[in-house]
Amino acid sequence: MKRSLPLAALAFAAAPAHATLSKGAKAPEFVAQGAEAGKPITFDLKAALKKGPVVLYFFPAAFTPGCNIEAQTFAEAIPKFKAAGATVIGVTAGNTDQLQDFSAKKCAGQFAVAAATDQIKHEYDVDLKKPDGSSTGWTNRTTYVIGKDGKIAMVYSAMKPEEHITNSLAAVEALKS
């Protein structure tokens, strides 16, 4: 946890997020290790898309202030996402050793979180950069809504966590109509 606090401060000073995957692009498929309700899981994007749209939200690190808010707000909104037929998955490269605990405490067991590999960070262009352009090793705060067809329906990058939930829910509900 000692390492988390200086890096959390750095996340707010980091360069703004720039997502290269645009609306209509094919979402890269991936399989990642993670946790749900405190238990280890394997998340497979291709399998999740067979059930419906996926809200894929990247966040800097488990147990940091903004990420706690984002996870708790997504957890509170899960009934609305489920009603729209969507699966929510949080993915991070920060504090991945704490995902089991984070999934139980901050996600309230409502959705899975997974560890971002270097390949996932690269394919989704979510490597959080320092002001000098070097990597922090964490992921930036970017949310993708992926339609059942595997195409990006929405992309939103901003450090303010609450807007990710409202924007992604609106995008998922638009897919339903």
Model-predicted segments: where are they?
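Structural microenvironment flanking redox-active thiols in thiol-disulfide oxidoreductases
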Residues: 68-111, 120
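Structural micro-motif
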Residues: 109-111, 128-131, 137-144
